[in-house]
Amino acid sequence: MPVDAQVLLAHVLGVGRAWLIAHATDPLPRDRADAFFALAKRRREGEPVAYLTGRREFHGLDLDVSPAVLVPRPETEGLVECALERLPAGRPLAVVDLGTGSGAIALAIASERPLARVLATDVSHEALAVARGNATRLGLVNVTFAQGDWYGALPADAGPFDLVAANPPYIAAGDSHLDDGDLRFEPTRALTPGGDGLDALRAIVAGAPARLLAGGWLVVEHGYDQSDTVRTLFAEAGFETIEARRDLAGIPRTVAGRKPGQAEIRVRPPPAMPESST
């Protein structure tokens, strides 16, 4: 049975996938079979499994998701790891996650750095409701939330921050990928800012130095073909120690940069990433 089908059947039955394997020959009640086939039909039409089940695992956290938020992706776990390398444990740090969506990045950081104060923002009230619900269910009390567009969401007394993280919309308007597969069902505003896809990244990079402590870090996710441009934006904004990372598929996916000044935090060496011609 394909993985998606296993996940949907486990969801319908309220059991784990291991239970399914152990009971593979058990008869399926008619009402559960009908529910499964209804979900399977929606999946064949392209609807994401995470929307059908209402759940997605991310960095070891079981998150609620809905069509109000982007489905958290494995590639974004690389951004979280990059951020954690710049946030030493055991220190009372200040972090902001811009455009939090389901809260995946903010909650992953908060769970790994319990002494950090993490602020999660989003322009969407519906997305913030999902993120707040996840924080409550996971018992993460070191996360707060604010509504608004990028830095416009920050309360007057917020910051300066040790680290700014963001996985903003970065797909160009008219990109054919927006009409493919799962993306057709996800919120357009979370996927593309319009134009060449870089407007949100431009705003986030340009505004970061004023919100960061000296020696603080900005870490962003970007599109598969945007690494060089994003690194240029970092350099133009005055960042140093600019580092590009590849995701597990070898595709350039994350850029981090340090605000000049006396370092407030130390970075442990990142793991070596294989080169790729992709």
Walk through the language-model features, giving the residues of each:
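C-terminal lobe and adjacent flexible extensions of AdoMet/dcAdoMet transferase-like proteins
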Residues: 254-278
